[in-house]
C-alpha cells in the first residue's frame, strides 16, 4: 500500500503543472517594449547553431543545485566569511514554473536577452546565466558544478557593506551571482540547460531563475544577532536557516 501522502504529492504536482500550462505569459505586464520569454512558441533561436538540444535536469541535478545553494546560505547565515548573520533566511526549494521559463530562455542561446520572466507568483524574479564553450561538453553534473564554483569564488569580493546596501560589484570584483543566492527574499529556484554546436566548438547555456532579485541600495538580507532569530521554525538539516514553510514574500523588498 502506498503511503498516505503519495496521492497528495501527486495531486500537488499535477496542480502545479496545470497552473503553468494555464498561464498566458503574453498577457503579463512587461516594462518598455520587452517581450516575455514564455510568450509564443518554444523554438530554438538562429543563434543556436547546429544540433541544439535542451537537456532534462534529473532529480540528481536539481538536488545538487539546491544542496549547493542551501549550503552556502546556511554557511553565511551563521556569520561566515566575515559577513553578518542572517535573521530570517529560509531554505530554497525547486520551482517547476521558474525552471520551465529558464529552459525557454536557454533556447535562445544568448545569456542576456532582456526578456521578461515574471510570473503571477513572482513579480521580480532574478536570473543567473552560465555559458560554457569547449571542444567537448562535460557531463551535466560537471557543468552545474562549474557554474556553482564560479559563484562561490565571489566570496572573496563580497563584503558587509554590500550585504547592507546591494551593488553588483565590490572593490574586488563582481558579486552578482553569490549575492542573489544569499538574498533572503529568494524562496525558490528553477534552472534549464541547452547545448549546441558552434562550428568546431561545443557550447552550453545554463540558466537559473530565482523567485526574487536584489535591489540596488537595499539589503541583501536582514541582519540578526543570531542565525535565524526571526524564523518561526528552523530547518532540521540547515540549522541556521528557516524551514521551507517559512512565510516569506518574495515580492517584498527589504
Swiss-Prot record:
Superkingdom of the organism of origin: Eukaryota
One GO cellular component term: extracellular region
A GO term, aspect molecular function: toxin activity
Record-linked Pfam families: CAP
Motif (Cell attachment site): 31-33
Keywords: Cell adhesion impairing toxin, Hemostasis impairing toxin, Platelet aggregation inhibiting toxin, Secreted, Signal, Toxin
Name assigned to this protein: Tabinhibitin 6
